[in-house]
Amino acid sequence: MTTWFNPSIQMQFRVIDGLSVRFAQSGDRGDHALLLSPWPESLLAFEPMWARLAEHTHLVAVDLPGFGHSQRRDALMSPRAMGEFVIQVADAFGLESPHIVAPDVGTAAALFAAASHPGRLRSLVVGSGGTAVPLQLGSLLRDWVENPDLDSFRRADPRRIVASSLTGIERYELPDSVREDYLSSYEGDRFVESMRYVRTYPAELPILRDLLPQVQTPVQIIAGRQDRAVPPVNGEFLHQRLPHSKLDIIDAGHFTWEDGADDYASLVMTWWSGAYAAIAAAAPL
């Protein structure tokens, strides 16, 4: 067990479906939420709002396989396969009808999970992840998705690539210990292998697009107005197709959960306290 600089976050490992998965959880509460790590970060991305979200909800945050410090399995490196693993994680922790918080790469996985398992998840909070068809991504992320020469990334210094990506955090002062956790998460071949997930977007996002109108799970979408990596049009794309959704565009860049942590946490807490149920009961958009 590793206790971070925030003593309320105690990181541990659990074997789920044969994989070593890093997780942290808060104290027990009546409601449950599963938080999925963004990329190229780790579950520590939720540290700025952990205490607030944990006040009334039992939190389980995980590094998805191949991300953060969790073990990778090549067969899971796509949103659709990862969505099935998300359900396995919920089962492993005994989370009945949990809320899901899934920014960035977790967005498509959570939506696939909701589409494939109606009624299993209470609600989703998503955003800042590629979902639009055709792709609507900033030039750097688009290159990671579409560049045919994966070996060029394999030859590059992964710590430098991740450090460059983290310059997109503009307001939040990232603690050195958290920065090192992010950098060490993708050392060796871990960054280039994690790219395989987003490189399935051209094949998998059209499948997800066709499933969105069938998703009955209520979805809160949070996007950053100044997001240059995954422009807000991705959130608008979801909102137009999901029958029970709410879209909020906040004053932040890509890393809304860190740069806009206060606004993000407020939206999530309002959502969990009853807004999700109102959206679920409302007539489809």
Where are these regions (language model features)?
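N-terminal cap/lid segment of alpha/beta-hydrolase-fold proteins
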Residues: 2-20
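Conserved HGGG/HGGXW glycine-rich cap/lid loop of the alpha/beta-hydrolase fold
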Residues: 19-69
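Active-site loop/oxyanion-hole signature of alpha/beta-hydrolase fold enzymes
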Residues: 16, 24, 61-102, 266
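Gly/Ala-rich beta-loop-alpha elbow adjacent to hydrolase catalytic centers
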Residues: 102, 106, 110
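Catalytic active-site module of serine/aspartate enzymes centered on a nucleophile-bearing elbow/loop
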Residues: 244-285
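Flexible "cap/lid" loop of the alpha/beta hydrolase fold
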Residues: 115, 121-153
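Conserved serine/cysteine hydrolase catalytic core
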Residues: 190-240, 251
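Conserved alpha/beta-hydrolase catalytic His-Asp/Glu region
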Residues: 135-137, 155-214
